[in-house]
Amino acid sequence: MQVNAILFDVQSIQKYIFANNKLKANVGASYIVDRLFEDVLCKDVIENIGIEVDTTSWLTRSDSITSLSKPVYVAYIGGGNALVLVDNEHESLVQDIVKKFTTQVLIKYPGLKVGATKGSITLDGTQFSTDLSQLYKQLKANQFTLNPIVHPANTGLTTICDFSGDVADTVQSFGKDKRLVATSFTSKFEAFEAANTRLKKNLFNTEAIDWVFPSELEDLGQNKSTEKSKTGINDIAIVHIDGNNMGAHFRQCKTLEERSALSKRVAAKTLESFKALIEWIIAKYDILDEHLELAENMLPIRPIIVGGDDITFICNARIAVQASHYLMQQLLSDANGMSISSCAGIAVIPTSYPFFRGYEMAEQLCDSAKSKMRAYNASHEVNESCWMDFAFLHGETAPTLEQFFANEYSSVTENMHFGPYRVYGATDKNTTSDMEALVQLLDCTIQFNEGAVMAQNKVKELRSVLQDNEHMWTVFLEQLRNTGKSMPKVAGWDMFREKLWTKVNNKMRTPYVDAIELMDYILPGLE
């Protein structure tokens, strides 16, 4: 049986979510994207077209579709896509549904891009997958040929919204103050409360909790004053974690039911893992409260995207690497028969740094980790591995990650950034022999902080020595030996301990600069 099909997608999701420098708007935008198809497509459009429809049974369906129970049937929602099936007697509704949905999105959520394509699908196990793949290809092709205008035009005579950069065309209240802002900003900002309510229910199963998630970037526990100087403690971190090879996993699904079931399992695993992270933070709260300047019951983390295999959150920079490490291990654990390997990018930025630029760097760092993952998997003939990369951004940064590392980590010998680093499962014993394992880097950083292997002033001197030539490395190591000190003893790092730099895969490398930079960005007791 062949029926009409409409495939929708949400485009430029990250740009829509992070195109503001107001945390409430970022959180609200994520909620809008996540609920778009259920709230607008299903409730506002399909359920009001005047005929019998089915918008919910896909949530519990386990058997294959052989016929439509209602003239209009929502077959699948997930991963930024929605598939709607329409029987042949009501083919005229296809264009009407697309028109009404896109119009509603433009009116309610200006700035949000959605795409749509139509075709036919055969409700047959083998042909169904082929037809659906063709729809996805067509939808992808449309992205390169259609570029809808979703913002009011800036004529040069209009006021610009301070928060979004769009044309300011409405008024928004901020406490006792009122500001002229863009409607695109207002729709996101006003969705914050609904997003916050759902977050509490998802993570704590109730709204009645004492714990508070920050609603402002300044509330993440940054240390406003410290005896140390140039520590960067007033920083936040943007963390982007993405599942590995998920597209390939979904392409292996031969039926819509398989795709839907996999989507639900992935989403459940992601939420379960993030819940575990929040529980870990609460369990360590005494340590956090000691080192961070947190308001009462304020958590130093705010999730922005927790959906599918995609997680983005902001947190206090001093817990970013350790929290991300724990979360990736939770994703990797095979509890309930589901394991997700992932890669992470962490951009550490000043609180006042442009938020979207920070997110772009986090995304590039995640891509860097994925590139390392693909190369490692191919050379070691393994299917899965997890990697993390990070960078510390201060002042003006280069437009690309490669240029940033070239500018900030250059030396006489080679680039001084050693990452990305491999993340192993909590019970994996192979980590002890891998020089690229994140736990080795953390071990070195902890030893630097404890001061037993060498004095703090020698650690600071080490960074400049690493930028210099081999003669200076030798002199530095000799000075350490003469004072009864040494480089940290780290499993798998014997070659670095002897010479500071060594050749790895035909390129001179050193991990010590990363370890030095991490010293102010890990907390004792979070291991």
How would you describe each model-predicted region?
Residues 1-527:
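Regulatory and interdomain segments flanking nucleotide-handling catalytic cores
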